[in-house]
Structures are given as structure tokens and as C-alpha cells.
């Protein structure tokens, strides 16, 4: 995750702003500079290489002292920064909005995936600039639309029906902020269209998840798509979701947390997010993740969760 101010800076033109991407040498200069505390939140002028990000965001970049940041000297950083600027320059950002826009925290991996989709000649985003910009505006929180299959971050499609598409995420192969844990495996499920879904499509998805992904929990971060994650990573997701929800509420960026379809979401996660929305503390909410839930009646007649061991998928072992 990183603020948009880590990728670009605003230049006032008439009554709106044009956004310009940073170059890696300006960032490198800022990372070595001694800056007064009162100037930590101001864009840094490198004199030689142009404007650089505010020094308060130093930890967002990979250095000898911080290996958890972005690999800003890679070509992928430039591609992501340019893509963000193209999207922001396609809309009007006024003086009253610019600080709020640049302080927004976005998913770096999501944006790298959109670059990969843009460069894939077989992908619809390669052929449609309009759809690409729409996908980026959704990714950076500048659009209220949800991420659907056409505008999704992408990955490897492992399941699809008339209503849903399931993607295996490819973060292990990333350049900008790769996941280093070689055991990482995670999926995302997007809606093909933002419209009511038939019971038969939900039943097909639930059957696929129970047969093939029984070692994973289906959760949501509240943004209109599902995530399929290892049970061992659920607590980590809970911490992140709770922190984001509270930060958004504190900063006034209140967006409706979409609980999604209770028939698909893992029962304990649904309880956790419902409790969070009611205003309970993190400790109270997280207890629900580890509590034995009363088994609800199966909403789909004839769809059993009972399988013989040799019939059950071993994905995730």
C-alpha cells in the first residue's frame, strides 16, 4: 500500500491540476536528503532531477534500511506512476480536492496488475483506453463503481460462470512490490456485471469453492468483490480491514462496507464484519473469527458439504 503522493505531484493549470509522475533519481535524492521536521509533508525539490515526494513517505520505498517498500528504481514504478497520472488527468481535480486525492492509500500490487493487463495484447484493457482509465480510477478510489471482471486487477482465471470470475493472484511474479513468501496463494472473485445474480450462478460458485477450495475462507474487504484466502491468513486480513475501516471513518471517507452474499462468505467473517459495522472494538470483532458458529440451514437443496477424503481438493496444502 502507498499514498498517491508517492507516485506523482500536482501542477496547477488554470482552475484544475495536472499530475506529473516522479522519476527515480528525484526520489533517490529525497531519500538521502536532510529535511526539517516542519517540511516533512511538503513535496521535495531535488534541484537537479525535479520534484520528489514528501519525505514523510520515505518508508514507502525500498532502501538498504527498509526492504518492505516499493522497488522504485524498476521500470514498473514508472509505468504505474504514468498510468495513475493518465487517469487523474482524465478528470478534473480542483484545489479543494487535491490534498484528499493525494493522501489516498492505494494497492500497489493492484496497480501493477493493471499495467500487466494493459500490456497484454490479448486483454480487453490493451484495446480500450476508456475501460483502462475506468479500471485505474476504481483502483485509486476515484470512482464509486465496484471492480467488475472487465475492470478487475487481473491474474490467472481459474473459474468462470455467467455471473462470477475467479482469479488466482500473481503477486509472486511482481517487480514493484512482490510477495516474498513462496507459499502465498490467494484468489479474488469479481462480479461479471454489477447487477442481481441468479441463485443457480451462486450455487455453481459455492459448489466450486466447496469442492476445490475447501482449505480456504471466502472473505470480503467490503469493496464489492470476494477474496479466497488461507485460513491461517484470516486474522491478518481482519487487522487490515478493521484498520482501513476505522481510518476511513476518521478521515471522513465513509464508503459503505459491502458485506456481499451471506451464502458465499465464510460465516465467521460475515459475523466479524457485521460486528465491525456496528462499532465494536477489534478484540470483540476478532473473537467471532475463532468462535464455533451454529451451522445454518443449507441454502441450496442438494448441495452437500460432506465429501469423502479422496474427493476433496488438496489445493493449498
Swiss-Prot record:
Q: What is its main location?
A: host cell
Please give one Gene Ontology molecular function term for this protein. ribonucleoside triphosphate phosphatase activity
The UniProt annotation places ATP binding at 107-109, 188, 221-223, 227
Name what cofactor the protein needs.
Answer: Mg(2+)
List cellular component terms (GO): host cell cytoplasm
Q: Which residues form the active site?
A: 225
Protein localization: Host cytoplasm
Stretches assigned to coiled coil: none
Keyword Iron carried by entry:
no
The record's section on InterPro entries has: Rota_NS35_C (IPR048306), Rota_NS35_N (IPR048573), Rotavirus_NSP2 (IPR003668), Rotavirus_NSP2_C (IPR024076), Rotavirus_NSP2_N (IPR024068)
Q: Where is this region: RNA-binding?
A: 205-241
Q: Which GO terms describe its biological process?
A: viral genome replication
What's a Pfam family this protein contains?
Rota_NS35_C
Its function, per the record, reads: Participates in replication and packaging of the viral genome. Plays a crucial role, together with NSP5, in the formation of virus factories (viroplasms), which are large inclusions in the host cytoplasm where replication intermediates are assembled and viral RNA replication takes place. Displays ssRNA binding, NTPase, RNA triphosphatase (RTPase) and ATP-independent helix-unwinding activities. The unwinding activity may prepare and organize plus-strand RNAs for packaging and replication by removing interfering secondary structures.
Q: Please give the family membership noted in the entry.
A: Belongs to the rotavirus NSP2 family.
This chain belongs to the protein called: Non-structural protein 2
Species whose genome carries this gene: Rotavirus A (strain RVA/Human/United States/P/1974/G3P1A[8])
Taxonomic lineage of the native organism: Viruses, Riboviria, Orthornavirae, Duplornaviricota, Resentoviricetes
Amino acid at each position: 500500500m502507498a499514498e498517491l503522493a508517492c507516485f506523482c505531484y500536482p501542477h496547477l493549470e488554470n482552475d484544475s491540476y495536472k499530475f506529473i509522475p516522479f522519476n527515480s533519481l528525484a526520489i533517490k535524492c529525497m531519500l538521502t536528503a536532510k529535511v526539517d521536521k516542519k517540511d516533512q509533508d511538503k513535496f521535495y525539490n531535488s534541484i537537479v532531477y525535479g520534484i520528489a515526494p514528501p519525505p514523510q513517505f520515505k518508508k514507502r520505498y525500498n532502501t538498504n534500511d527498509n526492504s518492505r517498500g516499493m522497488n522504485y528504481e524498476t521500470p514498473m514504478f514508472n509505468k504505474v506512476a504514468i498510468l495513475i497520472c493518465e487517469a487523474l488527468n482524465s478528470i478534473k481535480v480542483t484545489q479543494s480536492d487535491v490534498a484528499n486525492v493525494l493522501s489516498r492509500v492505494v494497492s500497489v500490487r493492484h496497480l501493477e496488475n493493471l499495467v500487466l493487463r494493459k500490456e497484454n495484447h490479448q486483454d480487453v484493457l490493451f484495446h480500450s483506453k476508456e475501460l483502462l482509465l475506468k479500471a485505474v480510477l476504481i483502483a485509486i478510489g476515484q470512482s464509486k463503481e465496484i471492480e467488475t471482471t472487465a475492470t478487475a486487477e487481473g491474474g490467472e482465471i481459474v473459474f468462470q460462470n455467467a455471473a462470477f470470475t475467479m482469479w488466482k493472484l500473481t503477486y509472486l511474479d511482481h517487480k514493484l512490490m512482490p510477495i516474498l513468501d513462496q507459499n502465498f496463494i490467494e484468489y479474488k472473485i469479481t462480479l461479471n456485471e454489477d447487477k442481481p445474480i441468479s441463485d443457480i450462478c451462486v450455487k455453481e460458485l459455492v459448489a466450486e469453492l466447496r469442492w476445490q477450495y475447501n482449505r480456504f475462507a471466502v472473505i470480503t474487504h467490503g469493496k464489492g468483490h470476494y477474496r479466497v484466502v488461507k485460513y491461517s491468513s484470516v486474522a491478518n486480513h481482519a487487522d487490515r480491514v478493521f484498520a482501513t475501516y476505522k481510518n476511513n471513518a476518521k478521515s471522513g471517507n465513509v464508503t459503505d462496507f459491502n458485506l456481499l452474499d451471506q451464502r458465499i462468505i465464510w460465516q465467521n467473517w460475515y459475523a466479524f464484519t457485521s460486528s465491525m459495522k456496528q462499532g465494536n472494538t477489534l478484540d470483540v470483532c476478532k473473537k467471532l473469527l475463532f468462535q464455533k458458529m451454529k451451522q445454518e440451514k443449507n441454502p441450496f437443496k442438494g448441495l452437500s458439504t460432506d465429501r469423502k477424503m479422496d474427493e476433496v481438493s488438496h489445493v493449498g496444502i
